[in-house]
Amino acid sequence: MVSASSLLLAASAIAGVFSAPAAAPVSENLNVLQERALTSSATGTSGGYYYSFWTDGSGGVTYSNGANGQYAVSWTGNKGNFVGGKGWAVGSERSISYTGSYKPNGNSYLSVYGWTTSPLIEYYIVEDFGTYDPSSAATEIGSVTSDGSTYKILETTRTNQPSVQGTATFKQYWSVRTSKRTSGTVTTANHFAAWKKLGLTLGSTYNYQIVAVEGYQSSGSASITVS
């Protein structure tokens, strides 16, 4: 059974505790970064894919790029926040396939994750999660059926938090899959269209779009391949 304190901590995560990654500078030596484990924030290209790894620096997390669309992440210590994964430097209404293993212990998400600007929006299409269901701490405003499951649609607001445009106040859009999975295809256009029908309009300019693992005050491991 989850304790009351754990529930309060989990509820705060979606409401504003999870720290969104700011745009980290692209490394000057991407070939070196591709071949070593990362423990501090970085972005770049690896195996023909864009990658983004952000950490608040307070937890024990290691991110490693593999061949093509593969990456791995492990985290310990039950503290701190990170987000990392592979995908594309510019998002779009693409179909994204992924497969792999995802073994969280505590608060964590596996999702298609990205940003837009004008306006500034952070979005999640959550495919799997750890002990905390992110849809439990916000009001469901709709749903969409896509890729073999129903997704709950949520909207939250972040105030004076890190973003791809520095510290800012912005909306978060969420689709949370009701039948969790660790492999499959995500048709992002279906989610974007469903959000728009509910008045959740993405920005006119797409920033990066990745299949990400995120952890908050938890531990675990994952190995994901994106295509």
Curated annotation (Swiss-Prot):
Residues 1-36 form the signal peptide. Induction: Shows constitutive expression during the early stage of tobacco leaves infection. Expression is not affected by the fungicide carbendazim. The active site is at residues 122, 214. Keywords: Carbohydrate metabolism, Glycosidase, Hydrolase, Polysaccharide degradation, Secreted, Signal, Virulence, Xylan degradation. One of its GO terms (molecular function) is endo-1,4-beta-xylanase activity. Significantly inhibited by the wheat xylanase inhibiting protein I (XIP-I) and the proteinaceous endoxylanase Triticum aestivum xylanase inhibitors I (TAXI-I), whereas no inhibition is detected with TAXI-II. GO terms for cellular component: extracellular region. Changing residue 214 to S: Does not affect the pathogenesis. It comes from the Eukaryota. Residues 112-136 are annotated as: Necrosis inducing domain. GO terms for biological process: xylan catabolic process. Its EC number is 3.2.1.8. Disruption phenotype: Causes only a moderate decrease, about 30%, in the level of extracellular endo-beta-1-4-xylanase activity and in the growth rate, but affects virulence, delaying the appearance of secondary lesions and reducing the average lesion size by more than 70%. Gene3D superfamilies: 2.60.120.180. Optimum pH is 4.5-5.0. It catalyses: Endohydrolysis of (1->4)-beta-D-xylosidic linkages in xylans. It is found in: Secreted. Optimum temperature is between 38 and 42 degrees Celsius. Disulfide bonds: none annotated. PROSITE patterns: GH11_1 (PS00776), GH11_2 (PS00777), GH11_3 (PS51761). Belongs to the glycosyl hydrolase 11 (cellulase G) family. The 25 amino acids necrosis inducing domain is localized at the protein surface where it mediates binding to the plant cell surface as well as induction of the necrosis on leaves, seedling growth inhibition, induction of a ROS burst, electrolyte leakage, cytoplasm shrinkage, autofluorescence, cell death, and induction of defense genes. This is Endo-1,4-beta-xylanase 11A. It comes from Botryotinia fuckeliana (strain B05.10) (Noble rot fungus).
